């Protein structure tokens, strides 16, 4: 149900949407809180990985994936006695030790290089990935409503980046 308000001498304005059941009021905010409390059960877990798993070196790309699908995720739950249908789509933010990449692609192992980063210095590097799930919900088959608050998952992995060294070899020659 839409809630309207008209200040004295003013125009009518929609101020909220609510659901009524047994004389109890459930607001859109209440429904969004219920969705946020439950969404982690229904969306794929992050299993972030990067390749090479060992032996990463400077000036060569490190290829990564979130471990999630880019497909939308749908689920139904009951909140305050209402059947709530939720549809969400993921997007990702990768933080490669201060270098940020925003994408709608989940990445993958080589040869999928859409999520990659080339480090220019050696050391232990923190890689953080945040999945943002945005979408909409529908209460008892009524009109679809955008989820106003963002639903996030985050994880991080550490990668040691070394320096590649060259070694000259001359098979069959006494001195190179």
Where are these regions (language model features)?
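Extracellular/lumenal mature domains of secreted and surface-exposed proteins
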Residues: 1-176
């Amino acid at each position: 149900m839409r809630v309207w308000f008209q200040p004295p001498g003013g125009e009518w304005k929609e101020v909220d949407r609510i659901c009524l059941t047994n004389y109890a009021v459930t607001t859109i905010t209440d429904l969004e809180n219920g969705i946020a409390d439950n969404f982690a059960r229904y969306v794929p877990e992050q299993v972030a990985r990067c390749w090479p798993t060992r032996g990463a070196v400077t000036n060569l790309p490190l290829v990564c994936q979130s471990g999630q699908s880019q497909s939308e995720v749908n689920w139904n739950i009951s909140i305050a006695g209402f059947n709530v249908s939720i549809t969400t789509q993921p997007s990702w933010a990768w933080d490669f030790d201060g270098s940020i990449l925003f994408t709608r692609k989940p990445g993958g192992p080589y040869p999928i290089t859409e999520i990659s980063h080339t480090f220019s210095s050696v050391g232990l590097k923190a890689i953080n990935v945040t999945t943002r799930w945005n979408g909409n919900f529908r209460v008892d088959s009524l009109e679809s409503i955008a989820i106003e608050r963002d639903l996030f998952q985050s994880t991080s992995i550490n990668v040691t980046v070394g320096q590649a060294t060259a070694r000259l070899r001359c098979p069959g020659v006494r001195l190179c």
